[in-house]
UniProtKB/Swiss-Prot annotation:
Zn(2+) binds at residues 73, 92, 94, 155. PANTHER family: 3-OXO-TETRONATE 4-PHOSPHATE DECARBOXYLASE-RELATED, FUCULOSE PHOSPHATE ALDOLASE. This is L-fuculose phosphate aldolase. Involved in the degradation of L-fucose and D-arabinose. Catalyzes the reversible cleavage of L-fuculose 1-phosphate (Fuc1P) to yield dihydroxyacetone phosphate (DHAP) and L-lactaldehyde. It holds the Pfam family Aldolase_II. Binds 1 zinc ion per subunit. One of its GO terms (molecular function) is L-fuculose-phosphate aldolase activity. The gene is fucA. HAMAP family: FucA (MF_00987). Its cofactor is Zn(2+). It is an enzyme of class 4 (lyase). InterPro entries: Aldolase_class_II_sugar_metab, Aldolase_II/adducin_N, Aldolase_II/adducin_N_sf, FucA. It comes from Escherichia coli O157:H7. Its EC number is 4.1.2.17.
């Protein structure tokens, strides 16, 4: 797909992320795999003011085009693509319930079968590191090895998928799961969970059932 169309999709995803209540202000960032690198949102520009010309290209060596500044979190986007060859889009936000669970430094367990949408029986919580650092990108790469989404301790959420629509859908789904988890934790701890065997059945069914969006 041509660059301007991808840039427009990135902007639309940012605006939809805000509309869904997953983000606010200039927090969060969105990227898509492009050529040997990626296109990513810039730093410090409110989503409603973004234009296609603001979107930044970063090559496979981590060098961004002149005259533009990418999101400070570009390193963990790059790490996500390196860790997940199947991913073509990454969404990061500071959704309230996901961030609350990340403050507890807990993974989201198999409280609901939709946990399998992230690729396993839980959604991990990557250890804290300062935003924008190589250390954080290393934590992200490890957490995403076997999952499509991870919480970031004291920070937020990352979701990656084959395209932007699926990545945003997954981010929204994880926020709902985080809300369910916190609601259940208010009643009992530990919370009841589905077994690994039950999640394995769901994972198998998800191979032929799920969000149908053109790649």
């Amino acid at each position: 797909m041509e660059r301007n169309k991808l840039a427009r999709q990135i902007i639309d995803t940012c605006l939809e992320m805000t509309r869904l209540g997953l983000n606010q202000g200039t927090a969060g960032n969105v990227s898509v795999r492009y050529q040997d690198g990626m296109l990513i949102t810039p730093t410090g520009i409110p989503y409603e003011k973004l234009t296609e010309s603001h979107i930044v290209f970063i090559d496979g060596n981590g060098k961004h085009e002149e005259g533009k500044l990418p999101s400070s979190e570009w390193r963990f986007h790059m790490a996500a693509y390196q860790s997940r060859p199947d991913a073509n889009a990454v969404v990061h936000n500071h959704a309230v319930h996901c961030t609350a669970v990340s403050i507890l430094n807990r993974p989201i367990p198999a409280i609901h079968y939709m946990i399998a949408a992230a690729g396993g029986n839980s959604i991990p919580c990557a250890p804290y590191a300062t935003f924008g650092t190589r250390e954080l990108s290393e934590h992200v790469a490890l957490a995403l090895k076997n999952r499509k989404a991870t919480l970031l301790q004291h920070h937020g959420l990352i979701a990656c998928e084959v395209n932007l629509e699926k990545a945003l859908w997954l981010a929204h789904e994880v926020e709902v799961l985080a809300q369910l988890y916190l609601t259940t934790l208010a009643i009992t701890d530990p919370v009841p969970v589905l077994s690994d065997e039950e999640i394995a059945v769901v994972l198998e069914k998800f191979k032929t059932y799920g969000l149908r969006i053109e790649e």
